Amino acid sequence: STLLASSAASDVYKRQALGISLNQVFDKESVYIHIMHGDITTRTGVDSQNIVSKVGNEVKAYAAANHYKATDFKQIIHIVDTDAAYLSDDKILEDLACMELSYQDDGIHTNNVGKVVDRNKQKTDNLYRLRGCGNIWNIPYRVYYMSCNLDHVLYDKRNSTDEEKENDAYAFAKKYKDNVNAFLEYMCESSFSVKGDFKDSWQFIEKDMHSIERHTNLPICLLEEIKDKES
């Protein structure tokens, strides 16, 4: 089985949007979508020293709750939002009218610059550790990004309300429900699709303004699965 772990906000909509299509891509084995509440990479007390064990604990808790053991899993695919975390500090822009973070072409708008600087440091340190980690709980593990978040990649919207997320997820799931080829074409052949080498794909997202732009390296995972199926 493939365990898809998603750590980001408005999680139920993410399950709805991606779940049906991914189940069709990975149809030889079941896909279990486990939603981590909130973003584990920015959780209080989580740092590069303990992030791997924290993700491992999530996987173990999920397995225990569903009566699985480590050998029941083929792989763990962890999908994270970049949340523009790789932007330089001068792209974190003070806007006292911003009650919530706002992701714009020129940077992150916030009423608390220091807090965002700290969050970005924590998130990028943790992602650096995770992307170099090949196994968690003896299960092959890889982390893939959605930039600047899942809504941005799937629907080209950066700052969606919960209502928009719900509506967009429903429409997306409906559109690709019985059309896995169209889903794969959209994810793997769009201007936002980052393909090729896994390590290179992370070096790409670190650069310039890329982590606030529309990019995902999930196609690397999808194309590998298709290749496996064909062999």
What are these regions (language model features)?
Residues 17-49, 56-231:
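C-terminal accessory helical subdomains adjacent to catalytic cores in phosphodiester-
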